[in-house]
Swiss-Prot record:
Binding site for substrate: 66, 111-115, 172, 177, 246-247
NCBIfam families the UniProt entry points to: PRK05286.1-1 (NF003644), PRK05286.1-2 (NF003645), PRK05286.1-4 (NF003646), PRK05286.2-5 (NF003652), pyrD_sub2 (TIGR01036)
Intracellular or extracellular location(s): Cell membrane
GO annotation terms (biological process): 'de novo' pyrimidine nucleobase biosynthetic process; 'de novo' UMP biosynthetic process
Protein's name in the database: Dihydroorotate dehydrogenase (quinone)
Organism: Aeromonas salmonicida (strain A449)
Length: 336
């Protein structure tokens, strides 16, 4: 009820300013009378996926809390899991501003942030401080100045540092905003990366005496053949889950709207059906071999149900959350 007022206020700022304000002040509201603004007590909808217990199947997608500075505040909203990041070995500022745009008529967002983050050490410190009892996924990527041929090393560095603190680790090879990154989704490059990650996962599992699942995040802009190849590689390399999908480069749904010409990845409602079709095709190719986390344009319980019906076991929200607010979590969990 209060969120439309808050959104009206936040939308007076440019999108990145609004995001930064939210990340700065949300944690400060916890434990004050104002935390009733977003705190929700939700019905239990427990599921077990990748060997992990989730109080409900609705998660926060990576990108909103890149540095893990709002975990407890988002946890109070009722999320069954929270994915922080994308984080890189070294801090980096990301791409030049402006780099975040609202496509309000379509309830979409275009971003070309470029993995701006404070580095993996800072993120781990934030995760260690968090009191949230749900599953925390940590999304890892490569630094922009790391040559793509050496990208594997960045993922392994991050994996080493986050392993003992993550519920699961998400491997981001599908952001359109880091040059060359999406090339890691194809053929030998994908196999080589996944094989190296799997070996390191097994080494770390022995070291820490616990198994932390690996999930790979893929793009929506893949052909059917490419989806089938990705699925085969995930199975072959023993990956535990797949997150479908990241943002799209496609502008067909918003071609005549403000900011349609901006470079970057499009998320929100315009991505909804495209990502669902990828999930459907991926589920067919995987044939139950590993679970899918469905993300892309979920802005209602019905949209979440469509993702689950297409083959997802869990769902994540981001852009829908920006437009609808914390009540979207309650709506989905209650009516899913």
């Amino acid at each position: 009820m209060l969120y439309p007022l808050a959104r009206h206020f936040l939308f007076k700022f440019n999108p990145e300013q609004a995001h930064d304000l939210s990340i700065k002040y949300l944690p400060r509201l916890l434990g004050t009378p104002l935390d009733c603004f977003f705190r929700h007590s939700l019905p239990k909808r427990p599921v077990t996926v990748m060997g992990l217990y989730f109080a409900n199947p609705v998660g926060l997608a990576a990108g909103l809390d890149k540095d893990g500075e709002c975990i407890d505040a988002f946890g109070a909203m009722g999320f069954g899991f929270i994915e922080v990041g994308t984080v890189t070995p070294k801090p980096q500022s990301g791409n030049d501003k402006p780099r975040l745009f609202r496509v309000i008529p379509a309830e979409g967002i275009i971003n070309r942030m470029g993995f701006n983050n404070k580095g993996v050490d800072h993120l781990v410190a934030q995760v260690k401080k968090a009191k949230y009892q749900g599953v925390i996924g940590i999304n890892i990527g490569k630094n922009k100045d790391t040559p793509i041929e050496q990208g594997k090393d960045d993922y392994l560095i991050c994996m080493d540092k986050v392993y003992d603190h993550a519920g699961y680790i998400a491997v981001n090879i599908s952001s359109p905003n880091t040059p060359g990154l999406r090339s890691l989704q194809y053929g030998d490059a994908l196999d080589e990366l996944l094989a190296a990650l799997k070996v390191r996962q097994q080494e770390l599992a022995a070291q820490y005496k616990k198994y932390v699942p690996l999930a790979v995040k893929i793009a929506p802009d893949l052909s059917l053949d490419e989806i089938n190849q990705v699925a085969a590689s995930l199975i072959k390399n023993g990956i535990d889950g797949v997150i479908a999908t990241n943002t799209t480069l496609d502008r067909e749904m918003i071609y005549d709207m403000p900011h349609a010409g901006e470079a970057g990845g499009l998320s929100g409602r315009p991505l909804q059906h495209k990502s669902t079709e990828v999930i459907r095709q991926l589920a067919k190719a995987l044939d139950g071999a590993l679970p899918i986390i469905g993300v892309g344009g979920i802005d209602s319980a019905m949209a979440a149900r469509e993702k689950l019906a297409a083959g997802a076991s869990l769902v994540q929200i981001y852009s829908g959350f920006i437009y609808k607010g914390p009540s979207l979590v309650k709506e989905i969990v209650t009516h899913i």
